[in-house]
């Protein structure tokens, strides 16, 4: 992978956007991880939940922390170290993967609600906002993945594949 000529302004904008995403992921991940740790190990079965985030997803919080740290790896891009674009690409890939998993869970909840409706239960849209995930489609990792799409577009546009001689 070679990097085409990238202006200093573009590099700084990409770095600032990546840092903003990284900080958001770190905030969401640390809250989810801390509340899940509290509910799992300190106050067993406790219902602690901060800012409406799920309080029982320890591994989702850890994944969000990792994604935030990967996005923060793009900080050297501010000084023109264009090799840091890889952190943006990997962070966006991890972000999209986590969002896809959560969207599949929401879809499975919808399928469950539909099958229950077919068997005679009353239809409810609750699966969309309060399903297995606790927050359903309002899960912050889903929306943060959508926020990372402009960044990955610019990063992919500024890179191209080339053959090594």
Language-model features and meaning:
Residues 1-165:
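Topology signature of small-to-medium multi-pass alpha-helical membrane proteins
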